Curated annotation (Swiss-Prot):
It is an enzyme of class 3 (hydrolase). Belongs to the YqgF nuclease family. One of its GO terms (cellular component) is cytosol. This is Putative pre-16S rRNA nuclease. PANTHER family: POLYNUCLEOTIDYL TRANSFERASE, RIBONUCLEASE H-LIKE SUPERFAMILY PROTEIN (PTHR33317:SF4). SMART domains: YqgFc. Could be a nuclease involved in processing of the 5'-end of pre-16S rRNA. One of its GO terms (molecular function) is nuclease activity. It comes from Nocardia farcinica (strain IFM 10152). Transmembrane segments: none annotated. GO terms for biological process: rRNA 5'-end processing. The keyword Ligase does not apply. Its main location: cytoplasm. Keywords: Cytoplasm, Hydrolase, Nuclease, Ribosome biogenesis.
């Protein structure tokens, strides 16, 4: 499997450090966007971008252009694109579309890291959370993609925090062992 098709996990070796991260939920009709705070602790919804239909080859689609604009507005250091896999972990048509979207976005913003992150059932869990909070089905359509993007990004932020904390603890243990 190509590296661009695998979901990634936070890695201290490639981590861009402090700064905002964006989470992207690529749907067939809409794209949900979420952002973190600069310390990478909390994900919040940003907006829902309409998915572009057919775009002439060689041109930047309006959805990619808008996401790139949001990346610049938020001065994002990293973009996490949800990679929807089947429950068996296989790549379906939605995953293929998310990978293609990530590649097109990568061409527009080459200086910003684009990561793919497993997002199985994020839309389902987002819909359940919205329903449980009293949002009616009709109102969900406007925010479901943002809620899924928040879920994707928050999962990444939580995992990143754990990875960075464990690296810090390992370095601390190593340096305190040097004193003995």
């Amino acid at each position: 499997m190509d590296a661009q098709e695998r979901s990634e996990r936070p890695d201290p070796a490639t981590d861009p450090g402090r700064g905002r991260r964006l989470g992207i939920d690529v749907g067939s009709v809409r794209i949900g966007v979420a952002s973190s705070d600069p310390d990478g602790i909390l994900a919040t919804p940003v907006e829902t971008v309409p998915r572009a239909k057919k775009v002439p080859r060689g041109t930047v689609s309006p959805d990619i252009a808008r996401i790139a604009e949001i990346v610049r507005e938020y001065e994002a250091v990293e973009v996490i694109v949800g990679l929807p896999r089947t429950l068996r972990g296989e790549k379906g048509s939605a995953a293929t579309a998310a990978i293609a979207f990530a590649e097109r976005l990568r061409r527009e913003i080459p200086d910003v890291a684009i990561r793919l992150s497993d997002e199985r059932l994020t839309t389902v869990s987002a819909a359940r959370a919205l329903r449980d909070s009293g949002v009616r089905a009709r109102g969900q359509r406007q925010v479901i993609d943002q809620a899924a993007a928040v879920s994707i990004l928050q999962g990444w932020l939580d995992e990143r925090s754990a990875v960075m904390r464990s690296v810090g603890e390992a370095e601390s243990a190593t340096s305190s062992g040097d004193d003995a």
